[in-house]
């Protein structure tokens, strides 16, 4: 499953929507909730990012992300 993680680069300032960034990770999980938990853990262990939201991408959403040219899987 591929998850889209919305984050701020630092935890030191209040989040601002205009500064929200995204990354994409692949997670093997039994269900969506376990995948979100695993994605959060993976990102928190490897970065100092302030995670705002984690979203499971549907096939159509993934296809759209690839078409827009912003899709790139992040590996830690």
Curated annotation (Swiss-Prot):
GO cellular component: DNA-directed RNA polymerase complex
Keywords, comma-separated and alphabetical: DNA-directed RNA polymerase, Nucleotidyltransferase, Transcription, Transferase
EC class name: transferase
Catalyzed chemical reaction(s): RNA(n) + a ribonucleoside 5'-triphosphate = RNA(n+1) + diphosphate
Subunit structure: RNAP is composed of a core of 2 alpha, a beta and a beta' subunit. The core is associated with a delta subunit, and at least one of epsilon or omega. When a sigma factor is associated with the core the holoenzyme is formed, which can initiate transcription.
Biological role: A non-essential component of RNA polymerase (RNAP).
UniProt-recorded name of the protein: DNA-directed RNA polymerase subunit epsilon
Phylogenetic placement of the source organism: Bacteria, Bacillati, Bacillota, Bacilli, Lactobacillales
Gene name of the record: rpoY
